[in-house]
């Protein structure tokens, strides 16, 4: 069986961020599976268009990447999403997998990062242990992408899990979800965590 791993990310328009995160993941997977074809796909159409226009990079969609693997004679595929939640992008990826299922002898898909109760606990522990020294006594705010999908509730759940584990004022705001940074600022004022609206980013995640 000719095998491949397809790494699917939302993508980013920031080259440095892409190299530090998405490319780093690909490199690590390549080291672990040196005899396996490693393919990449970008699930966001907007990001793909930006990469093509500004960087002259023809990033593949999940469907295009799967078709490419078929043309290469691949018969077994592991689809590895880096999506945090099982929202719109992850579901579109899964739809692409279903469209191509008959093209391969075997194709399996990993879950998004936050898919079950244990995931929230594990991610909360990892985040807090890596950032508690930076946070110190200050409240810690995470910014997520957010979505209109019902999976947007995942951000509230991970906030609750973080607070329970860290015993620290932790907040999660989103760019496109229900809970905005303005909502978080109001909550911080109500809780007496902060009396001003000037926020300083310690680290970009």
Residue ranges of predicted features:
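Extended amphipathic ligand-handling, pore-lining, and cofactor/metal-binding catalytic surfaces
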Residues: 1-196
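Flexible, D/E/H-enriched segments
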Residues: 199
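Single conserved hydrophobic/aromatic residue that forms the stacking wall/gate
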Residues: 202-205
